Amino acid sequence: SWCGPCASEAPALKDLHERYGDRVEFLAINVTGAEFFGIDKVTEFVEKYEWQMPVLLDEKGEVSQEYKVYAFPITVLIDRNGVVNHVIHGEFDPEDLEKRLAKL
């Protein structure tokens, strides 16, 4: 990925998904990669980090507009009622994110 922090947090995200995926729904959303680099680069990233979570493509930028994405990465925690619980702009701290996931 052209996004260094995205690649940096990818292994921790994989780990958290493996540990919390049965209780918390994880969705990775690719905002620019498919448009600028092609779907092959997105697939390559997912395979490199062995992600098993769904990866959605925001080709029209609708999701990034909805959640006011202005930098990458961004992590959005949404509770079971669809309410945004917490937003992390930039690379997340794995320990902090794990504590927040445990509370959802």
Give each language-model segment a name.
Residues 1, 30-33, 85:
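Conserved short-loop catalytic and cofactor-binding motifs
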Residues 1-2, 71:
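Short pre-active-site segment immediately N-terminal to redox-active cysteine/selenocysteine motifs
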Residues 3-6, 75:
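The canonical Cys-X-X-Cys-His
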Residues 4, 14, 85:
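Nucleotide phosphate-binding site architecture
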Residues 7-48, 59-65:
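Structural microenvironment flanking redox-active thiols in thiol-disulfide oxidoreductases
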Residues 24, 53-54:
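Short, conserved active-site loop motifs that form the nucleotide-linked donor/cofactor pocket
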Residues 47-52, 59-102:
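Thiol/disulfide oxidoreductase modules built on the thioredoxin-like
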